């Protein structure tokens, strides 16, 4: 039997595993023997040696032995059993908050005890609370572990000891089988066999470097981390290659439409925009679907890039669909494209949840017959009732939360007569390069790394909420004297939407009393979409001076006259989200300000994070720092398809390995396609997300 087949060996083949234990193991993702072997320890304890009490250090785990000096029960609100031991070098106190008479009687003065636990500082001597212990009888030798003791992530009702016993059985089975090494030597830079790596990591020898293990730096760990990242990358490459097996209509400009459109604009595209448009045009002339991600910082001009991509399809007599995450943003896009495209007789339709009844039916008919060449909307565009006449390009805006699976579904939606639409995905949330190389390995990536001229930098200040009165006066000055508009953003992270709405309403009431001369609007997540839309449009049309809002405005309308933003409890938000919010101002040519208001005292980490935002306007620098501080799951806003399942690797810790992995993956999938399939099966277990590719 080879390890490739171990995923077919049921857990019930192990002694002691019945239905109840199987169900508990399933809760932690263990369904077969291979899962069990890949369920590696999260840390280790050294129970292989006795440490003298005099040499103990607080906040670390040790095995000690000593003779009982005293055994006392302190009766208070809850009784505590305290046992002092001495080994001749010093003393230590063992404390038990849950105990019975049998335990108390076993600690007779003069008895020898072996104990293991975390050492804490005590008033008179070090202490261990609730240690694991053993009474050593009649000078019997003390039995110590031969390897480091693994600690696994587990679930209720599944003890560490049970997991260790099951792993011991799996390792014993591993010794009996011939394991075919899937990875060719030239693709294994760490030179550990899989068998050696698994054995060492489940049962490390006592002389191993614990520090290396804790940091994920041991060659045995690196071997598995490398292979897992390689498998994920191969799976994404497979999606990419799979896409190239599909047919798409090559789109060349048929007329001078692009030149005529550019001539109507009051500005010139930046060099970065021209470069990205060129990337897109090179993709669109191919006979397989484009899958391109365009990253551009807030205000970098992604909409113009989308317009030029759309015109290529429209010039070929085809349809374009643009999907935005909110109705507000979708309507803004629809209005922009109508304004830009009207001189050329191009019809732009829009479809969202609020378009109902006869209007909806009329819009659906236009889409079906091709009367509209471009359709803008929310995810409503991809409901079953929507039929496109001849869809050749799908543009997804602000959808970095889309996983591979959704991208594949969109491809299927636009299929017609064996041809599939090209896809352009745009995000204003800069994704750290290492993350993009992993999460978006199935996409080609372009970056708009230049802001249009005339954009003024935003001055960011970090202020304690104790200075709230000053800030309110600053808002008054901006709105009354400078005739500008302002945002006041309330945040209640990890609270319910109800509480967040109540907090926003309370702040709106306070500001309405403090600033009676201003027209103040309110937007929060509990409002109906139409109510939110109406308030946002009033703000856009300058009927409101100040908008009190929750983070629903992170992706929102373009209001060039808004030049001041106050963000309450800024320390509670991630850096990338703060950067997105800040991007709502600084859209005109007036100097703009963002005030990050925090609740004191501010911890060191929060201080450091807010300083990053104060000192940098570069979304890519900010996203790298955000990744360091919060990790990949948080930065992406959701556990990404294909990333959430990492068992051994850690994207933050192991990010330096990713470029090497990507290099190996490209070579391996060409030279050894069968090996690539085996690796994907081993680590991803043929997950559904890749089966359509």
Swiss-Prot record:
A Pfam match: RecG_wedge
GO molecular function, one term: DNA binding
Family the UniProt entry places it in: Belongs to the helicase family. RecG subfamily.
Domain of life: Bacteria
Organism: Haemophilus influenzae (strain ATCC 51907 / DSM 11121 / KW20 / Rd)
Domain Helicase C-terminal: start-end pairs: 482-628
EC assignment: 5.6.2.4
Swiss-Prot/TrEMBL domain comment: The wedge domain within the N-terminus inserts into the replication fork junction, where the lagging and leading strand split.
Keyword Transmembrane appears in the UniProt entry: no
Reaction catalysed by this enzyme: Couples ATP hydrolysis with the unwinding of duplex DNA by translocating in the 3'-5' direction; ATP + H2O = ADP + phosphate + H(+)
Name of the protein: ATP-dependent DNA helicase RecG
Stored InterPro entries: ATP-dep_DNA_helicase_RecG, DEAD/DEAH_box_helicase_dom, Helicase_ATP-bd, Helicase_C-like, NA-bd_OB-fold, P-loop_NTPase, RecG/Mfd, RecG_dom3_C
Phenotypic effect of disruption: Greatly decreased growth rate with many dead clumped cells in rich media, higher sensitivity to UV light, no change in the spontaneous mutation rate, no change in the rates of slippage in tetranucleotide repeat tracts (i.e. phase variation).
Residues covered by the Helicase ATP-binding domain: 283-448
Cross-referenced SMART domains: DEXDc, HELICc
Keywords: ATP-binding, DNA damage, DNA recombination, DNA repair, DNA-binding, Helicase, Hydrolase, Isomerase, Nucleotide-binding
Residues binding ATP: 296-303
Motif DEAH box: chain residues: 397-400
Role according to the record: Plays a critical role in recombination and DNA repair. Helps process Holliday junction intermediates to mature products by catalyzing branch migration. Has replication fork regression activity, unwinds stalled or blocked replication forks to make a HJ that can be resolved. Has a DNA unwinding activity characteristic of a DNA helicase with 3'-5' polarity. Involved in genome maintenance but probably not in phase variation, which contributes to virulence and disease.
């Amino acid at each position: 039997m080879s390890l490739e087949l171990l995923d077919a060996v049921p857990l019930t083949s192990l002694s002691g595993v019945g239905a109840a234990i199987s169900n508990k193991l399933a809760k932690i993702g263990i369904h077969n023997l291979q899962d069990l072997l890949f369920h590696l320890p999260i840390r280790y304890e050294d129970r292989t040696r006795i440490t003298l009490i005099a040499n103990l250090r607080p906040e670390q785990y040790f095995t000690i032995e000593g003779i009982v000096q005293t055994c006392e029960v302190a009766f208070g609100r809850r009784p505590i059993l305290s046992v002092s031991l001495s080994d001749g070098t010093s003393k230590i106190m063992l404390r038990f908050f849950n105990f019975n008479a049998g335990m108390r009687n076993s600690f007779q003065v003069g008895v020898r005890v072996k104990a293991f636990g975390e050492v804490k500082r005590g008033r008179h001597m070090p202490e261990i609370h609730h240690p694991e212990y053993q009474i050593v009888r009649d000078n019997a030798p003390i039995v110590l572990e031969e390897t480091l003791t693994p600690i696994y992530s587990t679930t209720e009702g599944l003890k560490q000891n049970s997991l260790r016993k099951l792993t011991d059985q799996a390792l014993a089975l591993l010794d009996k089988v011939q394991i075919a090494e899937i990875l060719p030597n030239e693709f294994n830079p760490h030179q550990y066999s899989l068998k050696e790596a698994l054995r060492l990591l489940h049962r490390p020898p006592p002389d191993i470097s614990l520090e290396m293990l804790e940091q994920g730096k041991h060659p045995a760990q690196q071997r598995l981390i490398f292979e897992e990242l390689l498998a994920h990358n191969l799976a994404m490459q497979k999606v990419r290659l799979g896409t190239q097996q599909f047919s798409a209509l090559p789109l060349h400009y048929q007329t001078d439409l692009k030149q005529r459109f550019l001539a109507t604009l009051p500005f010139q595209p930046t060099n970065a925009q021209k470069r990205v448009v060129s990337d897109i045009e090179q993709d669109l002339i191919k006979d397989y679907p484009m899958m391109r991600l365009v990253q551009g910082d807030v205000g970098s001009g992604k909409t113009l890039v989308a317009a030029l991509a759309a015109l290529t399809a429209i010039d070929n007599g085809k349809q374009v669909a643009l999907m935005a995450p909110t109705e507000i943003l979708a309507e803004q896009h629809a209005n922009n494209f109508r304004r830009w495209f009207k001189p050329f007789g191009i019809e732009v339709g829009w479809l969202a949840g609020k378009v109902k009844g006869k209007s909806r039916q009329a819009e659906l008919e236009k889409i079906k017959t091709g009367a509209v060449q471009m359709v803008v909307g929310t995810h409503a565009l991809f409901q079953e009732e929507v039929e496109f006449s001849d869809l050749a390009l799908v543009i997804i805006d602000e959808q970095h939360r889309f996983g591979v699976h959704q991208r594949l579904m969109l491809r299927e939606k636009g299929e017609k007569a064996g041809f599939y639409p090209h896809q352009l995905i745009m995000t204003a949330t800069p994704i750290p390069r290492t993350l993009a190389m992993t999460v978006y390995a199935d996409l080609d990536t372009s970056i708009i790394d230049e802001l249009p001229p005339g954009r003024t930098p935003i001055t960011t200040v970090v202020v304690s909420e104790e200075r709230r009165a000053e800030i309110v006066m600053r808002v008054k000055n901006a709105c009354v004297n400078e005739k500008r508009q302002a945002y006041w953003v309330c945040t209640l992270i990890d609270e319910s939407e109800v509480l967040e709405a109540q907090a926003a309403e309370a702040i709106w009431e306070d500001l309405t009393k403090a600033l009676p001369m201003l027209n103040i609007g309110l937007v929060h997540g509990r409002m109906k979409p139409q109510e939110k839309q109406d308030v946002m449009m009033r703000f856009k049309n300058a009927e409101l001076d100040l908008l009190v809002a929750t983070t629903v405005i992170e992706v929102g309308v373009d209001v060039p006259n808004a030049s001041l933003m106050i963000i309450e409890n800024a320390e509670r938000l991630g850096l990338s989200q703060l950067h997105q919010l800040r991007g709502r101002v600084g859209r005109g040519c007036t100097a703009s300000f963002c005030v990050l208001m925090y609740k004191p005292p501010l911890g060191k980490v929060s201080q450091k994070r807010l300083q990053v935002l104060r000192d940098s306007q570069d979304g890519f620098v900010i996203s790298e720092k955000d990744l360091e501080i919060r990790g990949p799951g948080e930065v992406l806003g959701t556990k990404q398809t294909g990333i959430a399942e990492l068992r051994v690797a850690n994207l933050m810790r192991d990010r330096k390995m990713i470029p090497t992995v990507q290099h190996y993956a490209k070579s391996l999938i060409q030279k050894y396609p069968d090996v690539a399939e085996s690796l994907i099966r081993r680590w991803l277990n043929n997950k559904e997300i890749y089966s359509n590719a």
